[in-house]
Amino acid sequence: TRLRTVTGVQTCALPILHEIDSDRLTREIQLNVGALTRLSHAAIRAMVPRGRGYLLNVSSVASFQASPRLAVYSATKAYVTSLTEALHEEMRGTGVRVTALCPGLVRTEFQSISSTEQYSRDFPSFSWLDVTDVARAGLRDMARGKVLSVPGALYKGLFAVSDLLPRALVRRISSLATGRH
């Protein structure tokens, strides 16, 4: 099912939580939360004694709001962003820089792996970021000591506005974008 929003942008209809295999959900949580936490821990333990290092954790703009039909994904990415912000503060003064890279839609193999390839065409071309540009932005922002890196003018704007809007309104907008209406 597809939905047209007021702006005329077609949006996709992703599965809701109870329609997703529980093993798939567990793997997503293990990867986005468990593995990232263990790798961050190991990296920081090696960097702190040296008094220098860089840690760039890949999160998502989905981490900034609840995303119906992407509930587990946005929740795990919220964890990544929150953990990274906390580590950024913990590492202050140690020479270790910690940044969360929070891109929006990026054209990669993720679409085929996540079975969302068919939804790619549902989003306007201007909403897609180039993977090389995203990587460069993340590395640049990390080198500058920024805690959050949000590549792309569209997503920077959405990020700025999302903090100003009531959470209920942001959830509703997210619902429209993911096909839950």
Where do the PLM segments sit?
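Single conserved hydrophobic/aromatic residue that forms the stacking wall/gate
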Residues: 1-12
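Active-site helix of classical SDR
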Residues: 40, 76
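Alpha-helical segment proximal to the catalytic Tyr-Lys
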Residues: 45, 89-90
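Residue(s) in the substrate-gating loop at a strand-loop-helix junction
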Residues: 60
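Active-site loop immediately N-terminal to the catalytic Tyr-X3-Lys motif
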Residues: 67-71
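SDR active-site lid
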Residues: 90-153
